[in-house]
Amino acid sequence: ERPRRTKAYPIALINKNINLDQLLAINNAMKYPLAYIQGPPGTGKTNTIINTIVTAFFNNVTVLFASYNNVPIDNVFEKLSSMKYRGKTIPFPVLRLGNTEKVMEAIKYINELRTQVQSLQIFASTLDKRKDDRIDRAKRLSARLKEYEEILDLKERKETLTHLMKYQEHMKNTMKLLPFQTDLQGYQMQKLDKRIAAIGEISDADAMQLLDRNEDEFYQYLFYTSARYIKALEEPKFQELRQILDSDETPEKLVNEFNKYMRKSENV
């Protein structure tokens, strides 16, 4: 069995363009150390990834997002780095890494964020209180998503059993079924139907009721919490990183030092 976290993680969304399947994907991404999001064009993959990263940020979880091509990575970075709160760009701590050029752009971006937050005043206790307000709602949403996941599994099992019974009915003249086999399948179908009825239908609206709808307050949280993380780069423990960021070395050497710093797991 895959390793998983059992904690109920608050889901934090920057928009409401989302459905139950996407919420389930975000919820599962928080429970497992690795998530793979796939689907045909137009199914909301990019939006799901963005909201997964924002949810991870809200829960103090670091994310490495990778793709087989640059387009989704660039799209996600563009969206996360251009979020605004009351006309001001949110200094969201996200980096677009890659070749030498991309790493140089990342270094420049970090320094721009450092300058942006320099004079900001942040009241951590207020931010923490707003976060605590979401915990109970998160537990209820997590329980509802667990039921939705069970419904999907039950319906899949019911469909498989239905196909099997139809096949056996079609082949009844060429194969002989023992009476207890038919009875067992009928019992299994009844059991599946009973459990599906017990859980009931779960709609997108049901899940959305358990999400925080105060968008302005959430963007305020993102703005000041992001700024708090960026301001933390001025603390003594980040001296090595600051020396790299403030260095006048050639781009090649600067990128080499930055990459070496980022390779250490304790630095990310």
Residue map of PLM features:
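Pre-P-loop entry segment of helicase/translocase ATPase cores
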Residues: 1-31, 103-122, 127, 255-258
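Conserved helicase NTPase catalytic core signature
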Residues: 1-17, 151, 168-268
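The feature captures the helix immediately C-terminal to the Walker
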Residues: 27, 50-51, 74
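Walker A/P-loop
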Residues: 32-52
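Gly/Ser/Thr-rich loops at beta-strand to alpha-helix junctions
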Residues: 43-45, 69-72
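Gly/Ala-rich phosphate-binding loop of Rossmann-like dinucleotide-binding domains
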Residues: 53, 57, 81
